[in-house]
Regions:
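Soluble ligand-binding/transfer domains with enclosed cavities or grooves
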Residues: 2-191
Length: 191
């Protein structure tokens, strides 16, 4: 009986691994696929994140590839790059929305936040400043940012996490699916 129970676990782990691979491929190549929501729901139920063991996996630059929102800036678009940088060890986060292609460095919106991991899945977010962010010229980052007075609590519940994929739910209930962009390094938070 134990042998069969172990086989079931192996089959389930294999199925979960294939589901993750399929979802990651769809997010990269077909982000408007109708199959994404079903795969997201399956992974959230069967493979919950645990930030007490996965904090290093959370750290890095993530690209939004799908969301349950109808807002255009929260939808994947070929001409728009939507990044989220999380550095929980430094307590910092950054959202970047910019045009794709070579002009993207001149037309970006940046929102900086303080973040803190408060449970096995929850990351509290306190937005601090936001505005236009341009290129770095002569070692100086060109930007025009204003302070933000956040009047509501914000958080992300990280529901699925591995080295390449993150699924989370925001405080407004929106579900996000992001892929890791390891080639985009963490920023110098002092600039």
């Amino acid at each position: 009986m134990d042998r069969h129970a172990n086989m079931g676990v192996l089959i389930d782990e294999g199925t979960l691994a294939q589901t993750r691979i399929t979802l990651a491929e769809l997010l990269r190549n077909e982000p408007s696929s109708d199959k994404i929501f079903e795969l997201v729901q399956q992974l959230v139920q069967e493979q919950p994140a645990d930030l007490s063991d996965q904090l290093d996996q959370l750290t890095g630059t993530w690209e939004l590839r799908w969301s349950s929102s109808s807002q255009p800036w929260l939808k994947q678009s070929p001409g728009l790059l939507n990044l989220q940088i999380l550095d929980p060890n430094q307590g910092r986060g950054r959202n970047i929305l910019q045009l794709g292609g070579p002009l993207g460095q001149f037309a970006g919106i940046q929102v900086d936040a303080d973040i803190s991991v408060v449970s096995q899945q929850r990351v509290n977010v306190c937005f601090k400043r936001g505005g236009w962010a341009g290129p770095t010229v002569a070692g100086r980052k060109l930007q025009l940012l204003r302070s933000i007075e956040q009047s509501f609590p914000a958080w992300l519940d990280i529901t699925v996490l591995d080295d390449a994929l993150r699924i989370c739910r925001g405080n407004a209930g929106t579900i996000f699916a992001l892929v890791k962009r390891p080639e985009i390094r963490l920023p110098d938070w002092t600039l």
